[in-house]
């Protein structure tokens, strides 16, 4: 708990597939998933989300025509009361929860009533990340969260990740950015050809060593089958 773990590997190594399988976006063909101390079998992404796993994918699942609260609560809206077959939404409650989530992560959105289509790439990414705080996730997974962002927007997202670390929020970060990984994570798991080939503590390795595992020049003894 509270650990930030990076997953690294070359293109096609299996990083994103791993994430899609533990969140039940794809069905596994083998293996088991242990989450929060117990074996789990999610029947779909909604079940994984309800268990407390929030995922920020490379392609953000945001609705351009909706504002920030509506995006955060899309598919899990707060209900004030039901009126026959109709539900009356608690817009005030959703707005307050959105502001609380933004404060918790340090996300700065000038006007949460703006629709997503009028926001920068960095602001969009921050909105996606803020969902993890709004719904008190037990695990946050970020798949290349800064891949398409500029320098300033990348710094903003990285500051949010640091805030999550300070608050003891566990994180899995998929990234090709060595500087980012060494700066933000406690442990680095390297994938190659669909298998783990190294599990490294940050303080016991360096960028050159990690690259050697990624390229196949090295493989940890316990993962010799991945060579």
Question: Which sequence ranges carry the predicted segments?
Answer:
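Glycine-rich phosphate-binding loops of nucleotide-dependent enzymes
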Residues: 1-227
């Amino acid at each position: 708990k509270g650990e930030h773990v990076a997953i690294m590997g070359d293109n096609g190594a299996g990083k994103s597939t791993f994430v899609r399988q533990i969140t039940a976006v794809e069905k596994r063909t083998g293996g088991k998933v242990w989450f929060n101390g117990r074996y789990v079998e999610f029947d779909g992404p909604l079940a994984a989300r309800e268990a407390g796993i929030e995922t920020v994918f490379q392609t953000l699942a945001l609705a351009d025509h909706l504002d920030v609260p509506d995006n955060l609560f899309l598919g899990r809206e707060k209900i004030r009361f039901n009126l026959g077959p109709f539900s009356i939404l608690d817009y005030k409650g959703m707005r307050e929860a959105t502001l609380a989530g933004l404060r918790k992560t340090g996300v700065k959105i000038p006007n949460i009533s703006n629709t997503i289509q009028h926001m920068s790439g960095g602001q969009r990414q921050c909105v996606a990340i803020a969902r993890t705080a709004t719904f008190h996730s037990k695990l946050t997974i970020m798949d290349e969260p800064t891949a398409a962002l500029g320098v300033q927007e990348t710094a903003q997202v990285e500051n949010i990740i640091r805030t999550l670390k300070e608050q003891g929020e566990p994180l899995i970060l998929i990234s090709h950015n060595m500087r980012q990984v060494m700066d933000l994570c406690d442990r680095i798991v390297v994938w190659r050809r669909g298998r783990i080939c190294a599990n490294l503590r940050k303080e016991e390795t360096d960028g050159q060593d990690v690259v050697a595992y990624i390229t196949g020049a090295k493989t940890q003894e316990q993962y010799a089958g991945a060579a």
